Amino acid sequence: MPWIQLKLNTTGANAEDLSDALMEAGAVSITFQDTHDTPVFEPLPGETRLWGDTDVIGLFDAETDMNDVVAILENHPMLGAGFAHKIEQLEDKDWEREWMDNFHPMRFGERLWICPSWRDVPDENAVNVMLDPGLAFGTGTHPTTSLCLQWLDSLDLTGKTVIDFGCGSGILAIAALKLGAAKAIGIDIDPQAIQASRDNAERNGVSDRLELYLPKDQPEEMKADVVVANILAGPLRELAPLISVLPVSGGLLGLSGILASQAESVCEAYADSFALDPVVEKEEWCRITGRKN
């Protein structure tokens, strides 16, 4: 069905209040967008980080009388009569089909493909991981996930144990198992991530070789030949003492979720325990790898 959207521009501090006003005026959903496309990379836990200059967009049913909506909003103390806004009619589309059409099989390195379930695999003889795009967890489209998948593809994982620290969808652990690892361990603070990893492992036929833990449940003694952590620079620095003990002597470490501008500080946190390789960059993100001393 067609929709009508009304867009307001405000400051991040006022965005929540105007969101409430739009909902009270009849909006069925609200979206916040940065006016200048400035990314937010690391909000604090529990924090909704908004931009200094924010567009608040309300979506309304096509039958809505927008004159009535504007009249209601004009009574809001932050807006007033003649407030600046933009109203647009959105064309009717099969949004689900359009969303699905945007996702195609993706190749990482020489052997590995990530394929959504509604697409045919490009190469039956390749290493194929079947994974559908979700709302919260990695599917390979982000540069940091791509960097980690390319790194795993470059390794000989035959018979190895791999730890995926901050496993999310389980994409890295599952890819490692499909690439020949004997066992993978996924750790995440989010129970939904643990469930997503379990479901994706079952879909790919590797659930019998994947162990999944919340941090409070993980074994005290865990070691692996390869450890990969695609989280964020802040946690990677703070958790360096914990992550650094996970690889066996001579084991490999791969870190991502790091902006190129943050690479130096993350390297410093691991330099005493690892012989680090040159940093690899993709867009504004990077990957740090090394071998345990």
UniProtKB/Swiss-Prot annotation:
Pfam families: PrmA (PF06325). Gene3D superfamilies: Vaccinia Virus protein VP39 (3.40.50.150). Transmembrane segments: none annotated. Keywords: Cytoplasm, Methyltransferase, S-adenosyl-L-methionine, Transferase. It is found in: Cytoplasm. One of its GO terms (biological process) is methylation. It catalyses: L-lysyl-[protein] + 3 S-adenosyl-L-methionine = N(6),N(6),N(6)-trimethyl-L-lysyl-[protein] + 3 S-adenosyl-L-homocysteine + 3 H(+). One of its GO terms (cellular component) is cytosol. The keyword S-adenosyl-L-methionine applies. GO terms for molecular function: protein-lysine N-methyltransferase activity. S-adenosyl-L-methionine binds at T145, G166, D188, N230. InterPro entries: Ribosomal_L11_MeTrfase_PrmA (IPR050078), Ribosomal_PrmA_MeTrfase (IPR004498), SAM-dependent_MTases_sf (IPR029063). Its EC number is 2.1.1.-. Methylates ribosomal protein L11. Belongs to the methyltransferase superfamily. PrmA family. This is Ribosomal protein L11 methyltransferase. It comes from Escherichia coli O81 (strain ED1a). The lineage of its organism: Bacteria, Pseudomonadati, Pseudomonadota, Gammaproteobacteria, Enterobacterales.
